[in-house]
From Swiss-Prot:
EC number(s) given by UniProt: 2.9.1.1
Protein name as it appears in the record: L-seryl-tRNA(Sec) selenium transferase
Top-level taxon of the source organism: Bacteria
Modified residues (N6-(pyridoxal phosphate)lysine): 295
Compartment annotation: Cytoplasm
The family this protein is said to belong to: Belongs to the SelA family.
């Protein structure tokens, strides 16, 4: 047996022989000699390992060339390739949150393709500020005196706290000490900002007198945090921003209001739960308001800071600001997204996030009925497909108690022993993956976010029958 194994190893062609095989021509043309050589070496290493493990024959040059090419093709697929988000979570943190509007995509591409006046004043010919591209827009849409932005909302909170309360005290209700995604907690961010946390009230009830008692000569800021990713219900009490602003004004201490997801419009007009708007927070007297760009606003990831001019100027003087600034590509997309809000009557048509959230149940249910026959053919006979009414959610910590009527396709095994995890894995392995959620003994594909029916059916039809067996 040992001699036979050695013989099979000797039968393996050399790297050069594989590269000279006709089957390698297309690979060399497509991927180049260096990458092809490395792939052939890897294919030969796999073949040697297989022979050592008992494989009965040595693959020839053509087989090895095809194996090398297949590995290069697999490597060429981007890990961030497009997929179908059928999880029912519109703003899925792990799937990139907001899908950008076409106007934002076009603006970003233009900024990538050519030089742009990022920090250049076209009127004076002198150096400008990158914030100028969105400052006036943010002030117009929020009613604030001034505005700036950084690369995400956690950075906005960090920067503001460091500016207002480094080495000083920051007063916040215990019920607002939130934890956001990735186990990042507000107390940790405050500590990194150099602020000393002063908790007031209790988890479920905080009163104005709690803040008043906590005020001291060391107070740098009063912080209000909108608990956008959870709700405390029942025997509760909290102090509104307007009351806190009045108290802060009396004490000559700034009020900072972190809205988290943030929204520029009244969402109730689209059938969603009402959230406090940024304009309302500004009007209530918050000195600084922070909010996200890639959640309810429907744009790229960003952290917006709006409020009193003197406070914004202080934020902009903080050296930390430069480390957190946004690049030209994102800034171009942000500007284009914000401009869409100037026309609220057509916003749902142009902003994908809002369009998907406001999509009527009847439309989604009709789509499910259209897709069901072809979907059933793609997974039969191992699985069966049925129409299923379900509930979608906003996601990314926004409107945690607000679910939306939706419809989808639920795929269940015809044989109870078949694995739903295996089916989910097969869908993830597609060239354009399909991501659903497992519930109620099946894999549910919530169709709220499906806009490309033909592409979905094409991906589904590419399922490997062996993977489903």
């Amino acid at each position: 047996m040992e001699g036979s194994s050695s013989g099979r190893l000797r039968d393996l062609p050399s790297v050069d022989a594989v590269l000279k095989a006709p089957a390698a021509l297309a690979m060399l043309e497509r991927f180049g000699r260096a990458a092809s050589t490395d792939a052939v070496r890897a294919a030969l290493a796999d073949a040697r390992a297989a022979i050592a493990g008992g494989a009965s024959h040595a693959p020839d040059a053509a087989v090895l060339a095809r194996a090398a090419e297949a590995s290069l093709e697999a490597d060429e697929l981007s890990n961030m390739r497009p997929l179908f988000n059928l999880t029912g979570t519109v703003l899925h943190t792990n799937l990139g949150r907001a899908v950008l509007a076409e106007a934002a995509i076009e603006a970003a591409v233009a900024a990538m393709r050519d030089p742009v006046a990022l920090e250049f004043d076209l009127e004076t010919g002198k150096r400008g500020e990158r914030d100028d591209h969105v400052r006036a827009l943010l002030c117009e849409l929020t009613g604030a005196e001034d505005a700036t932005l950084v690369n995400n909302n956690a950075a906005a909170v960090l920067l503001c706290l460091n500016t207002l309360a480094a080495g000083r005290e920051a007063i916040v209700s215990r019920g607002e000490l939130i934890e956001i995604g990735g186990a990042f907690r507000m107390p940790d961010i405050m500590a990194r900002a150099g602020a000393k946390l002063v908790e007031v009230g209790t988890t479920n009830r905080t009163h104005l007198k709690d803040y008043r008692v906590a005020l001291s000569a060391q107070t740098g800021v009063i912080l209000k945090v909108h608990t956008s990713n959870y709700r405390i219900e029942g025997f509760t009490a909290e102090v509104g921003a307007a009351e806190l602003a009045a108290l802060a004004g009396q004490a000559n201490v700034p009020l900072m209001n972190d809205l988290g997801s943030g929204t520029l419009i009244d969402l109730s007009r689209y059938g969603l739960q009402r959230e406090p708007t940024v304009r309302e927070a500004v009007r209530e007297g918050s000195g600084l308001v922070t909010f996200s760009g890639d959640k309810l606003l429907g744009g790229p990831q960003a952290g917006f800071i709006v409020g009193a001019r003197a406070l914004i100027e202080a934020v902009n003087r903080n050296p930390m600001k430069r480390a957190l600034r946004v690049d030209k590509i994102r800034l171009a997309a942000i500007e284009a997204t914000l401009k869409l809000y100037r026309d609220p009557d057509r916003l749902a048509e142009r902003l994908p996030t809002l369009r998907l959230l406001a999509r009527p149940l009847a439309e989604i249910e009709a789509q499910a009925r259209r897709l069901l026959p072809a979907a059933a053919v793609a997974v039969e006979p191992a699985y069966q497909v049925a129409l299923r009414l379900c509930r979608s959610q906003v996601g990314s910590g926004a409107l945690p108690l607000d679910t939306i009527e939706s419809a989808g396709l639920i795929i269940r095994p015809t044989n109870g022993s078949r694995s739903l995890e295996r089916l989910a894995g097969a869908l993830r392995a597609l060239a354009r993956p399909i991501i659903g959620r497992i519930e109620d003994g099946g894999l549910l594909l919530d169709l709220r976010c499906l806009t490309d029916e033909a592409g979905f059916l094409s991906s589904l039809s590419a399922l490997d029958a062996d993977a489903l067996a």
